[in-house]
Amino acid sequence: MDFSKAFQYKKWANNELLDIGEQQFSILPERDATFFVRILNHTTVVDSLFISRIMGEPEKYSGDNTVETPTISELRETMNQNDSWLVQYVGAATKEDLKRVVSFKFIDGDTGQMSIEEILLHLLTHGSNHRGMASRVLAENNLERPKDTFTRYLHQLEPSRRVGG
């Protein structure tokens, strides 16, 4: 499986959501604004945990979210670092790399094993799920939300796909 476009899309979708969310952040009720940041921060922490596991390095977090809620700019910085790492990694990964099995401990202490390919698929689906939750907060407040679809990303990236459809 070629993950390159999927992780480029993930990075694009994260930036789209943060851009639109940040523009309207002051309009959100405090509880919803906090949820918006914390649910996206959760995905960023989980990305970081699995990146550490892929690299065989110590994990930077002891939970699946941080105690303190980051600012949107702090969240954006960490999210972009993770997304950039993932885009670079999948661009260079071989089929053998993707089949490699990683053993690790989940945050709750249970042990687990996943192939790199399974980890990457988890990060894609997990991130999409929680972007949807954050986007729902915008919708519930009658605010603009991104059109977070892979098809939109592909057609924006390659406008020639619209010709002759």
Put a short name on every predicted segment.
Residues 33, 81-85, 103, 133-134:
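Short amphipathic alpha-helical surface micro-motifs
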Residues 59-100:
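Helix-adjacent hinge/juxtasegments
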Residues 4-65, 107-165:
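Short, contiguous alpha-helical
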Residues 2, 49-50, 74, 85, ...:
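Exposed alpha-helical structural elements
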Residues 26, 98-103:
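Glycine- and aromatic-rich loop/turn segments at beta-sheet edges
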